[in-house]
Curated annotation (Swiss-Prot):
This is Magnificalysin II. It comes from Heteractis magnifica. Belongs to the actinoporin family. Sea anemone subfamily. Pore-forming protein that forms cations-selective hydrophilic pores of around 1 nm and causes cytolysis. Pore formation is a multi-step process that involves specific recognition of membrane sphingomyelin (but neither cholesterol nor phosphatidylcholine) using aromatic rich region and adjacent phosphocholine (POC) binding site, firm binding to the membrane (mainly driven by hydrophobic interactions) accompanied by the transfer of the N-terminal region to the lipid-water interface and finally pore formation after oligomerization of monomers. Residues 3-12 are annotated as: Plays an important role in the hemolytic activity. One of its GO terms (biological process) is killing of cells of another organism.
Length: 22
């Protein structure tokens, strides 16, 4: 995401994806 808020959301989404795959 280009916006800072979007970047934070993308990071959180990636973290949740990793947790869900464990």
């Amino acid at each position: 995401s280009a916006a800072l808020a979007g970047t934070i959301i993308d990071g959180a989404s990636l973290g949740f994806d990793i947790l869900n795959k464990v």
